[in-house]
Amino acid sequence: MIKRLLLLLTLTLSTLKGWSQDPQFSQFYANPLYLNPAMAGSALAPRATVNYRNQWPALSANFVTTSFGADIYLPRFNSGLGMLVLTDSQGLGNLKSTEVGLQYAYQLRLNEETYVRMGLQGTFATRTLDYFGLTFGDQYSNQGYTGNPTQEPIVGNGIPQVSYADFSSGAIVYSDWYWAGLAMHHINRPDQSFSGLELARLPMKTSFHAGLRIPFAGYTYLGDELDREKTISPAIMYKSQGKFDQFDAGLYVTYSPMVFGAWYRGIPIKKYAENINNHESLIVLAGFRQDKFSIGYSYDATISTLGFASGGAHEISLSYIFEEITPKRPRPRRKDRQLSCPKF
């Protein structure tokens, strides 16, 4: 009985934590528009992405997130345009959110080898909370749950909904062998209160991501295009939102057309609380990329107090890059350089 109560408490706290945190993706480079608005148009061609994540599938308090992204590069203006649609359903209480964001990014050449991209994003978001399945304090007595209907006034108002505008920005600098980016989401800290009686501001999220691309064998070219990539890419990401922060460190191995990766997520030098270590998950990834198409699968093995009872997290990513758009009267220019970060 004690173990069940502890598990319920852990799930409840994790769900409440999720209300003030953004959904996360382990394959963050497979969802570039969600990671950093500066990555809009970074494929230098029209691109479409789909990402699906199911976290804690073995529990009723699971988190299911789906996103669709589309972006395009406009070479005449050194600019990228993007659109991101995201839906998220968070476990206990059926908290659901839908977001539609538009992005603009500008690409600037610093020198022969180095580029910088800067991006802005405007988002319209809607959240709803279905109280079905939730219980409240007045439904309990000394003997436990009574089953009586709650008298909480907010429950009688139907399914509450809140909508708000949200703004984000980001930048990334890169060359053929490294990249480093910084993104700031929810700069305006919008109010997401359902009752409207008190402010419930969405905390700003700051994330830093960086890595290296190291060849372990010679590149194979087909004409002017890279035909087979053989690289090792160590990478890190740190993000902070409100009172919560997270660190990811891992390695990609690319041997075209296959990509494999392994990651650790957690901050071992920082504890959640006394005697509770900050170890979250170990992540493994397998991906396939052929021509313009990419598909990836990753699994998060939970190593926190939830353990294997949660079922970890499953994630699938799809991406397709269309033919480049060339102006009818192209002006003489140097060939732009794609981002060197992995595609998963």
What does each model-identified segment do?
Residues I2-L6, D22-Q24:
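Short, basic/polar N-terminal leader/transit segment immediately after the initiator methionine
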Residues M1-R4, L110-E112:
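Positively charged n-region of N-terminal signal peptides that target proteins for export
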Residues R4-S14:
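Sec-dependent N-terminal signal peptides
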Residues Q21-F344:
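Subset of outer-membrane beta-barrel
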Residues M1-I2, T15, Y34, T326:
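Generic N-terminal leader/processing signal
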Residues L16-S20:
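Sec/Tat signal peptide C-region and signal peptidase I cleavage site
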